[in-house]
Amino acid sequence: MKSQEDPQEITTGLVATQDLPENHVFLIADPGLEEIVKNELQACLQKNSCNNPNIVTRPLGFDGQLWVKTPKGFPLHATAVKLRSIHHALIPIHYFDLPTENALAHIENEVGKLSLPLLNTVNSFRVTTQRTGKHNFKSNDVERRAGAALWRKYGTSVDLKNHDVDIHVNIFEHICLVGIPLHKKPLSNRYRKQFQPRIALKASIAHALLAFGKIDPTATSTVLDPFCGSGTILFEAAHYSSKLSLYGSDIDPHVVKGAQMNAEDLNLTNKIQFIQGDARELNTVFPQQRFNHIVTNPPYGLRFGQHLNFERFYIRILQQFWYRLTPDATVVLIALKWEKLSAALRLTGLYKILEKQRVDMGNVKPHIVSLRRIQKETE
C-alpha cells in the first residue's frame, strides 16, 4: 500500500507528477490570509529542515491561494495536511484559461485529455467543484461534464457519497484548476460539535486570529474570548499552546452551555473555563482576573439587535477590555464595521493599532485587527 508521500501516478497528458524533480501542492485558504498561511508553512517546513521552499502566493492571480514546491524527498504532503490556516491542500494536475463561450465544453474536453491512471485502480470517484466569480453555469454543471469525461475514458463508477477518490475541478473566475485533495474533508472542519450556532467562526480564521495576536506559544499567559460562541477560538488556542490559561464568556447562557458541551467532546474541559456574562460589563464578569490577550469575534449585530450602534458598542467593549488586560497586552478582534471601530479607537485612545487585514469570509468581508493596550500614567 502506498504511503501518503509516495508519488501518485497522475499526469496532465504532458508531464507525469512522479517524473517531476519536486513535490507540488496547491493550498486554498480564506482570501486575505496568504501571509498567515505562508508564515505557518515556512515554520513547519523549517522544523523539518526544509529551509529553501519555493512558495508562491496568488499563483493564479487570486487571493487565498499558494503554490508550494519542495525537493522530491521532503514530506510536503504530510506537512500540508497539518496546516491550521487553510481549507484545502491539492496535488495540482492541470490548469487552463476558460473561453468566453462554450466554457463547459472546453472544461469537458480538457479534463478528458488528462491521464489519470489512479482511476484504473479504484472502484469509484466523484468530481467536486468550488467556483468563484460570475458564470453562465453552475458548479454542478461542471461536476457533471467533467465527471462524464472521466467516466467515458476510464469506465470507473461515479459515487457521490462513498467514492474512493475525489477529483477537484475548481473554477476561479476565468481559470480552471484540476487537482486531487490530500484529505477527505476541508481541513478547517476539524471540530465535531454538538452545539453549532447558525453563524460559527471557521477554525482557519480562529488560527489566524491567534497568529495576528503574536501569542508566544512558549510563554505562560492568559487568553480570554468574551464572545466565545461555540468555543472555536479557545479550542484552537488549546492546540496552539499548552501553556495558555483559557477563558471564555458569552452573554447567552444557552451558548455557554453549548460551548461547554463542545469542550467536553474535545476533552478540553480541564483547559478552558467558561462563564456566562456580558462583555459590555466585563469588570463584573471577571472582577479579579487580568488577561494577557483577548482574542474574539464580536457579534455583527445579530444577537444584540439589527439596530446596534456599532461605534458605541465598540467604545464600550474597548473600555471594558482595557480594565481587564495586563499592561502591554494585546487584543485581536474581527470588525465588520471598520470605520466604526476606527472611530472608537480614536475616541478612547486606549490602544495602538498593530496590524489590520481584510479577510473574505464568504458572505462578509471584515477586518482582522490587532491592538496593543496603551499604558496610562494614572493607572
Regions found by a protein language model. Give the residues of each.
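Active-site periphery "cap/insert" segments of enzyme catalytic domains
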Residues: 150
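Conserved AdoMet
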Residues: 62-117
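Short glycine/proline-enriched loop/turn "hinge" motifs that connect secondary-structure elements
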Residues: 115-121, 170-171
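Class I S-adenosyl-L-methionine-dependent methyltransferase catalytic core
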Residues: 2-75, 113, 132-133, 137, ...
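Short glycine-rich, basic-tinged beta-strand/loop micro-motifs
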Residues: 119-135
